[in-house]
Amino acid sequence: MTSTEWRTGLTGAQQAEIRALIDAATTHDGVAPVGDQVLRELGRDRTRHLLTTDDDRVVGYLNLAPAEGDDPAMAELVVHPQARRRGIGAAMARTALAEGGPGARIWAHGNIAAAQAMASSLRLVVVRELLQMRRPLTDLPPVPDTPGVRIATYAGPGDDAEILRVNNAAFSWHPEQGGWTEHEIDERRNEGWFDPEGLFQAFDEQTGSLLGFHWTKIHDASLGEVYVVGVDPQAQGRGLGYTLTLIGLHHLAEKLAGPEPTVLLYVEADNSAAVNTYRKLGFEVFSVDAAYAAN
């Protein structure tokens, strides 16, 4: 018998079950059903957790981040592969949309067939798309010269204020990347993947101010990520985004020891300028994440 309930906090055992559920879905679908932020929230009470159990076994999980300002509530969910086609995902999504309020959205990572079927049954429409683009870390273009710019890696928390200034100026429009505080940097600095040598910064040689940065991430021996590239809007037009991206790609190419090293990145599907820039760097679309909302 299945039952569904909201939880503000999760026990250690529940967190372990949810992680195992996510792993099972990832293996089955070939794409992770939730993003890194959801994993960080499992041990916290900043978001709400909807659990569906079947004979005391967690078969469905949904994370609901509440609306903030102009940004609508955002949900991500996963159903165990062996518990699908029973309406569990649709029921959880319907509950989250009602709880989330006007404009609430549900992310479908990879927008797999099961997610599309659920969205269709609820008459949801795609309101946002995020492209995952990839390219092999071979035959990289050389890094162009940057006169008047000094490149340095992350030196510690003393760099944070400038990184936050540039990040929040570059992503003032972005619902997840914008509005960062020291807390967001602290969270990522405490992650096992964080490497100060993989966070590159471009400084104006005359003023010393930060012009842009590229934060890289290594997933495993064969896969790296362009985690964040941010350029101060007042420094745009100088090719800094291109240069910083290439610096990070060369770094990842040196670090990854796998036989076919690859790099991924995420970019908004409607950001045509960024998509075109990444295509020029050899990236191609690998998968699409879709955010659904009520029509």
Swiss-Prot record:
Swiss-Prot/TrEMBL catalytic activity: 1D-myo-inositol 2-(L-cysteinylamino)-2-deoxy-alpha-D-glucopyranoside + acetyl-CoA = mycothiol + CoA + H(+)
Annotated 1D-myo-inositol 2-(L-cysteinylamino)-2-deoxy-alpha-D-glucopyranoside binding sites: D36, E176, K217, E225, Y266
Residues annotated for acetyl-CoA 2 binding in this entry: 229-231, 236-242, 271-276
Molecular function via GO: mycothiol synthase activity; protein-N-terminal-alanine acetyltransferase activity
Family: Belongs to the acetyltransferase family. MshD subfamily.
Function noted in UniProt: Catalyzes the transfer of acetyl from acetyl-CoA to desacetylmycothiol (Cys-GlcN-Ins) to form mycothiol.
Assembly information from the UniProt record: Monomer.
Protein name: Mycothiol acetyltransferase
Species, as recorded: Mycolicibacterium smegmatis (strain ATCC 700084 / mc(2)155) (Mycobacterium smegmatis)
